[in-house]
Amino acid sequence: MKKNIQQTVTELVSPVVESLNYELVDIEYVKEGANWYLRVYIDKPGGISIDDCQAVSEQVSDLLDKDDPIDQSYFLEVSSPGLDRPLKTEKDFAKYKGELVEVKVFQPIDGKKIFEGELVGLKDNIIVINQDGHNVQFERDEVAIVKRVIKF
């Protein structure tokens, strides 16, 4: 049920978000405590401001009120995915190629579940990072999450 809501909302709001010149990065529909949250993550070159979030929130809220794809009450949140956003799409992997990433796997590989290295890319569902001069490959379905590592 939750996945269907995410897919339905994605299909519904994606054209609106794109028409406002933003990228729809992800949608989450989660329960926290007694409340449900619909989180819409957007991005654009140069980053996202509060005004950007407000503009998208107003349009998406109006659309969701009209089409009403969710039965129960929920809170709508629109935000940036953050600097350490998870990489999910082929576009994400292409965009952040050459950057430092952290790969977390479901099952340990040689006793490790977390790997850090430079993102080489994603091809044929194989994620490749360069770790200390050696390419390390991961089957995409073995990977729990890939996210950027931000060094300050």
Swiss-Prot record:
Family: Belongs to the RimP family.
Name under which the protein is recorded: Ribosome maturation factor RimP
Record's keyword annotation contains Protease: no
Keyword terms: Cytoplasm, Ribosome biogenesis
Primary localization class, coarse: cytoplasm
Location(s), subcellular: Cytoplasm
Superkingdom, taxonomy of origin: Bacteria
Function statement: Required for maturation of 30S ribosomal subunits.
Gene3D superfamilies: Ribosome maturation factor RimP, C-terminal domain, RimP-like superfamily, N-terminal
Keyword Transmembrane appears in the UniProt entry: no
GO cellular component terms, A-Z: cytosol
A biological-process GO annotation: ribosomal small subunit assembly
Pfam families in the record: DUF150_C, RimP_N
Disulfide bonds: none
Record InterPro entries: Ribosome_maturation_RimP (IPR003728), RimP_C (IPR028998), RimP_C_sf (IPR036847), RimP_N (IPR028989), RimP_N_sf (IPR035956)
